[in-house]
């Protein structure tokens, strides 16, 4: 299970109000930045960075019932996963990719984020050379 021994840290907590967000668009325009847009009933946000190393999409139901470690699920379910985005420390996915990459082991250094909305879960790996930013649109 990929979430075993990982630590999820809430990020952008004070910037993103509670809402029923859905992921509407994933833009991959490398000339500018890559964006994941969230549309809520009252709010709209976009997460952007220069380049994602990896992006994986899941239905929320599948991710929360079959992929997420049960202990992690219990920890965050009490708030109905309202934070929307978490940075994953000690990411096993990053470690797996480091060992299977063409780089020397330990040199990939991606940051792992999980975005949970009402209908989807997106896991993204952002290159350590690129920062994930948030803005309203």
Regions picked out by a protein language model, each given a short descriptive name:
Residues 1-137:
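Surface-exposed, interaction-prone regions used to assemble/regulate multi-protein complexes
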